[in-house]
């Protein structure tokens, strides 16, 4: 897949873009340890529907540089906002997992650049754990994702536990691509650094400032939430989102259930306000 890059402090972030330059912009943001190809089904449908679609890799992931010292929701949100400005926003932001948290933070920070949110498996707050519990998890990530076994462990966890339920026809291909990407020492090092730094507390602190229309998909089998239904209800209340609970799906509704995510997303986008040119109107800057 061909890609371009945008310069950021400490390195370049990779993205691919398709669709007419004057079409309404949609930016797709993957989650931790994932690649922009996670949006394969949704990106194709959005482009076919007439949208301009940009899919980005996270810092240190995929085709992005592996030179970053700062990772997480806020850093990712800054990268996404820079990309929206570079491509000529506003844009609808579509994010998975921590990418969803970054999208929500971006909407609070720059409502003039964010016309809507579509979130899958959204992390908008940290799980309820003690400080000691969080420290143990971070330490375990450091050990589990070390060389030479780290790429294999992550691929197995992504392809198994985090993808419980139904799978895309290209599931095995995607998991193999993740393992190949993480087999590179620099990429795996960046992934471990992200695991150690990641917190969604900055997002939770700003959910009350998110005013843009939002749609969220939560898998009923998502192991990242102790009670996915309760988490979905909290997300709906916190940001005023329409929440779709997806059966037989875990953390990746975008490729586990495209038959649910694609039509609902297209309907959501169709219902958003448009300017005279058909593009998203700019909101007020915070």
Tell where the protein language model's regions lie, with residue ranges:
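Active-site loop/oxyanion-hole signature of alpha/beta-hydrolase fold enzymes
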Residues: 16, 48, 52-94, 98, ...
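Conserved HGGG/HGGXW glycine-rich cap/lid loop of the alpha/beta-hydrolase fold
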Residues: 17-63
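Conserved alpha/beta-hydrolase "nucleophile elbow" surrounding the catalytic nucleophile
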Residues: 30-32, 95-100
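Conserved alpha/beta-hydrolase catalytic His-Asp/Glu region
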Residues: 128-130, 148-208
